[in-house]
Amino acid sequence: MKFLKTHLDDIVRCYCTSHMFIDEECYAFFASENPNSECYSYTGKEFKKKEVVWDKDRGGCMSIIPFKDREGEFLAVNEFYLKVSPSAAKLVRGKKTKDGWEVKDLFNLPYLHRFDIYHINDKDYVVCATIARDKSNKEDWSRPGQVYIGEIHSDLDNNNVVLTQIADGLYKNHGYTR
């Protein structure tokens, strides 16, 4: 197998990458962990077609996870900043439209760092992991993180995601694995 390295852009502190297929075309996503930072998608021949997924009104992106059964839709963590308290971290939904990308907030969850989407029995669920309940500063790990689960309804515009805590007491809960 041969890999070809391609320079697409200069993104300061690019922390998150992901991809999805829409109409059999691959879209690559790149987002920064910095505040007030854009997220871009790249597609087309040699990924030369660049689109703004969200503008500088967002940032702090930790993860972008596409839905398996909802073409052109994803969830992402926005506004995660370890040094900021209180935390403004939130989960957002992105959706490809004929005019570009539409991104809407779903819910705030302080110190939301990692999440995943599970598709079980024709329903989608989100599992969210926080690194802490609260922090007085970046090095404060005295209040543990939690894990939550909630159903993601097919009509997210008219249904809220209700989270249920399923684990607590997770100190320095930085990672996640399926």
Give names to the regions the model predicted:
Residues 1-178:
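Beta-propeller-forming repeat regions
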